[in-house]
Regions:
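Short, C-terminally biased terminal segments at protein or domain edges
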Residues: 1-86
Length: 86
């Protein structure tokens, strides 16, 4: 169950970014990025839960947590930059 949720939220980030490439305007583009950001937060949650319940060890969790943090920061920067250009 947990791994299915992680897979769903993690792949949804990429799916929404792909959809953003074909957005019907800036508002739609930002919306897709904001959805991807929410999915990134959810992915971080599932990773933390898997780690805290002992399903994944720290040596697997830490790099994944760092990757999620980097993706989150990139998404936030992209959203803020796009909003500033409006």
């Amino acid at each position: 169950m947990l791994t299915n949720q992680l897979l769903r939220s993690g792949t949804s980030i990429g799916a929404n970014l792909h959809e953003a490439q074909y957005a019907q305007g800036t508002k739609d583009f930002i919306s897709k990025f904001e959805i991807a950001l929410k999915e990134c937060h959810e992915t971080e949650y599932w990773l933390e839960l898997l780690y805290e319940t002992g399903y994944i060890p720290a040596e697997q969790f830490k790099p994944l947590q760092n990757d999620c943090g980097a993706i989150r920061r990139m998404l936030i920067a992209s959203i803020n930059t796009t909003k500033a250009k409006q």
